[in-house]
């Protein structure tokens, strides 16, 4: 259905059939939150919700782009000769950003494209719609221009676009999880070294439920950059006493020795979260490999509590979802996922209890918050693909 809409929209806007169709997933992070920029381990996986594209290579230097998610903007047109950021160009700044970074890196891109996209990720829900779009664009350009970009390089290019062009100080996790995604596997990623390992997601007779607060979160102007600065400031202080390049190089035991050097109580709590969360990721992956799903779920719960109390990035909406999820029968664990401040939480729920879970948590959320949450049963899909 989505592909038919995509094709007909392409024909309506550009007067011809598209050459190619593509898909790029969104992602959830099972555990390891707000530590990708602190040199920690994360454990994300791609989901089957994501961003679809229809695209055709042009024979001039013009790009024309249309999004079914932002129909009121119409077709946005620009030239490869002017890839400067313009606020009014909205989502196409991601397209311009990827083009600019690739061209600056010496990749030969000398023709424009016609592009229609349609995403079924809830916008602003913290499921990485922007990284999904970046990896989609890299995949399209890689395919059209035979650029031979590795999956790891694709992720690094997306991160560079985010940091230097869009102006969001994000880590590597989202792009990496999407670019290197494989069906039914999560990725244990060391964000310091980019060492990674695929771990089969054997959840037995349980499913991952995505719970969307339907409270939009805007990464760029949320407290995300503030948290990053608190961590960077703490790292600068700790570097005077110990030879580390990121917070997550310390164990909780080692941090005990140095924690009195962090005088600001807020910054101290940020460090406690980062260092303990990194240890939780390692413990959680070990538990999953040993088929100890109960422990995996408990670690998810502990992660949410740390994000709530020490990192302070959850808020009433996410806490309402997680805390009500914990009370339900058949629930192994639940936590916020993504950057927080709204967005989504996830829960691992026994298949026999899914309907009851959605009903009960949904009602509790509506009673407490005043509007409805949305629920999705997550499937773990592949990375960016040409369809």
Curated annotation (Swiss-Prot):
The record marks 27 as: Transition state stabilizer. Mg(2+) binds at residues 130, 162. ATP binds at residues 67, 124-130. PROSITE patterns: GALACTOKINASE, GHMP_KINASES_ATP. One of its GO terms (molecular function) is galactokinase activity. Pathway: Carbohydrate metabolism; galactose metabolism. The keyword Kinase applies. Pfam families: GalKase_gal_bdg, GHMP_kinases_C, GHMP_kinases_N. GO terms for biological process: galactose metabolic process. Its EC number is 2.7.1.6. It is found in: Cytoplasm. Gene3D superfamilies: 3.30.230.10, GHMP kinase, C-terminal domain (3.30.70.890). PANTHER family: GALACTOKINASE-RELATED (PTHR10457:SF7), MEVALONATE KINASE/GALACTOKINASE (PTHR10457). Belongs to the GHMP kinase family. GalK subfamily. This is Galactokinase. It comes from Clostridium perfringens (strain SM101 / Type A). The gene is galK.
């Amino acid at each position: 259905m989505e592909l038919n809409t995509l094709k007909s929209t392409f024909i309506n806007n550009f007067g011809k059939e598209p050459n190619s169709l593509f898909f790029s997933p969104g992602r959830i992070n099972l555990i390891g939150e707000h530590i990708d920029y602190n040199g920690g381990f994360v454990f994300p996986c791609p989901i089957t919700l994501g961003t679809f594209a229809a695209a055709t290579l042009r024979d001039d230097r013009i790009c024309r782009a249309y999004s079914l998610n932002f129909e009121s903007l119409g077709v946005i047109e620009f030239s490869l000769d002017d890839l400067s950021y313009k606020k009014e160009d909205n989502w196409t700044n991601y397209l311009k950003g990827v083009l600019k970074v690739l061209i600056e890196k010496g990749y030969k891109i000398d023709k424009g494209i016609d592009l229609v996209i349609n995403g079924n990720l809830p916008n602003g829900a913290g499921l990485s719609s922007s990284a999904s779009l970046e990896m989609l664009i890299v995949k399209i350009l890689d395919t059209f221009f035979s650029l031979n970009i590795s999956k790891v390089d694709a992720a690094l290019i997306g991160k560079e676009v985010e940091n230097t062009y869009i102006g969001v100080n994000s880590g590597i996790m989202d792009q990496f999880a999407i670019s290197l995604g494989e069906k039914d596997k999560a990725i244990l990623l060391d964000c310091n070294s980019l060492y990674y390992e695929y771990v089969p997601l054997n959840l037995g007779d349980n499913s991952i439920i995505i719970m969307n607060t339907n409270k939009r979160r805007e990464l760029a102007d949320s407290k995300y950059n503030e948290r990053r600065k608190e961590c960077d400031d703490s790292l600068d202080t700790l570097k005077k006493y110990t030879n580390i390049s990121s917070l997550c190089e310390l164990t909780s035991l080692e941090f005990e020795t140095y924690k009195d050097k962090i005088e600001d109580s807020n910054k101290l709590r940020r460090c406690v979260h980062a260092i303990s969360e990194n240890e939780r990721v390692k413990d959680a992956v070990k538990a999953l490999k040993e088929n100890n799903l109960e422990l995996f779920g408990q670690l998810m719960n502990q992660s949410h509590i740390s994000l709530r109390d020490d990192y302070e990035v959850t808020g009433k909406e996410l806490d309402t979802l997680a805390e009500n999820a914990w009370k339900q029968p058949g629930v192994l664990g639940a936590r916020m996922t993504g950057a927080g401040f709204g967005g989504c939480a996830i829960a691992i729920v026994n298949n026999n209890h899914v309907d009851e879970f959605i009903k009960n948590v949904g009602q509790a959320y509506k009673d407490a918050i005043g509007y409805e949450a949305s629920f999705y049963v997550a499937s773990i899909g592949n990375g960016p693909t040409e369809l």
